[in-house]
Curated annotation (Swiss-Prot):
Gene Ontology molecular function: L-cysteine desulfhydrase activity
GO biological process, one term: L-cysteine catabolic process to pyruvate
Entry-linked HAMAP family: UPF0597
Organism: Lachnoclostridium phytofermentans (strain ATCC 700394 / DSM 18823 / ISDg)
Family of this protein: Belongs to the UPF0597 family.
Protein name as annotated: UPF0597 protein Cphy_1256
């Protein structure tokens, strides 16, 4: 089981440059250009509603200020390197950017709504005379399921709900996660977690220093002061400020999301520093926070109308409770307290206001932690709270997957009209 847990961390905690939905579009486009082997005359991108929602209003990385599906597809075509996966746009040059802007102005890229049961689904088609290519990406941000050249399928693969199909999420439960975090040889996971600390702290500090979006992170510190409870919210919010508004620094993601990767890690890091605990304890707390978030999202799915900052913040709260010396019952109660409070936050796409939602979710997690450390918490029958942690999480999964299905459709309609 321990090896499977380590495999999950290795598969999930990977670097990504910029918001992952436009990156996924750029990746599919770069791959389609590679398959075609020449500059196309026509480019068409078909996207599921959740991809449209998450790519519509966020700045595409490496483009400075370009937003939207067309920009992501064109810059991926012109300057992307599909071999770099989630860092596909690290090769983009100024010349590539100028050509992207020129093609955008001509209406070169056509976009279509893709009728599909999948939340994460992209099809990119290119044509050059009689030649054509097609790349289909489904379920995960790097999950290329089908490639066609001149109408002939050259590659086809069944995609699992994780970028690494060998990963087994069935081992995850709150109890198994806590057992693993307490007993694993920390040296086996240290490089993964220290990279998360390094990358995510760096972009958070960038978001605090400079102007990105509405600067939720720095505003929190300016108005409320430099207290750990404020820093724990301000750091991930600042990272999101930067990431949603074109910052080119990479982030270590969680569950396919940079915002969730920052939400799940930075509050734990800040409380660890304030409590002056040993580095190893911070790393073990990060194991808990990351895996609790992954556990929830592995059931909910990568994209949903349910805001992923909530599941990430619940994980962060669990990690913070661990840092305070909380026992298993208190960690369980922290997760329950968080989910009882903010499970109603909806996802209306990737954009500047994600930073504010992160701050709200982390605030709820901090409150949840302090309540649980006092031996208190919301009880079975308090709304969606059930009599066990497992049943409570199962209920939230049902809420996110089934209850919010129509919510998701209505959100997309509002955004597009």
């Amino acid at each position: 089981m321990y090896k499977k847990m380590i495999d999950i961390l290795k598969a999930e905690l990977v670097p990504a440059l910029g918001c992952t939905e436009p990156i996924a579009i750029a990746l599919a486009s770069a791959k389609a250009r590679e398959v075609l082997g020449e500059m196309p005359d026509e480019l068409t991108v078909e996207c599921s509603s959740n991809i449209i929602k998450n790519a519509k209003s966020v700045v595409v990385p490496m483009t400075k200020n370009l937003k939207g599906i067309e920009a992501a597809a064109i810059v991926g075509l012109i300057g992307g390197d599909a071999n770099k996966k989630l860092e596909v746009l690290t090769t983009v040059t100024e010349e590539d950017l100028e050509e992207t802007k020129r093609l955008l102005a001509t209406g070169f890229c056509q976009t279509k709504f893709l009728q599909t049961t999948e939340k994460l689904h992209i099809i990119v088609r290119m044509k050059k005379g009689e030649n054509s290519s097609l790349v289909e990406l489904v379920k995960t941000h790097t999950g290329i399921a089908r490639i066609e050249k001149d109408g002939v399928v050259t590659f086809e693969e069944e995609i699992e709900d994780c970028d690494d199909s060998t990963v087994d999420y069935s081992v995850l439960s709150v109890a198994s996660i806590l057992d693993f975090a307490n007993q694993v040889d920390i040296e086996e996971v240290r490089p993964i977690l220290e990279r998360q600390i390094e990358y995510n702290t760096k972009i958070a500090k960038e978001g605090l220093r400079n102007t990105y979006g509405v600067n939720v992170g720095s505003t929190l510190l300016d108005v409320y002061g430099d207290d750990v409870k404020i820093r724990a919210k301000a750091m991930p919010a600042a990272g999101s400020d930067a990431r949603m508004n074109g910052c080119e620094l990479p982030v270590i993601i969680n569950s396919g999301s940079g915002n969730q990767g920052m939400t799940v890690s930075l509050p734990v890091i800040e409380f660890g520093k304030m409590l002056d605990v040993e580095d190893e304890k911070i790393l073990r707390a990060l194991i808990i926070s990351n895996l609790i978030a992954i556990y929830q999202k592995s059931e909910i799915g990568r994209l949903s109308a349910y805001c992923g900052a909530v599941s990430a913040a619940a994980g962060a709260g669990a990690g913070i409770t661990y840092l305070y010396g909380g026992n298993e019952e208190q960690i369980n109660q922290t997760i329950i307290n968080t989910l009882a409070n903010v499970s109603g936050i909806v996802c209306d796409g990737a954009k500047s206001s994600c930073a504010a939602k992160i701050a709200s979710a982390v605030d709820a997690a901090i409150v949840a932690t302090m309540i649980s450390l006092k031996g208190k918490g919301f009880l079975s029958g308090d709304g969606i709270v059930k009599d066990t942690i497992q049943k409570t999480i199962d209920g939230v999964v049902t809420l996110a997957k089934e209850g919010m299905q129509e919510t998701d459709e209505v959100i997309v309609k509002i955004m597009l009209n």
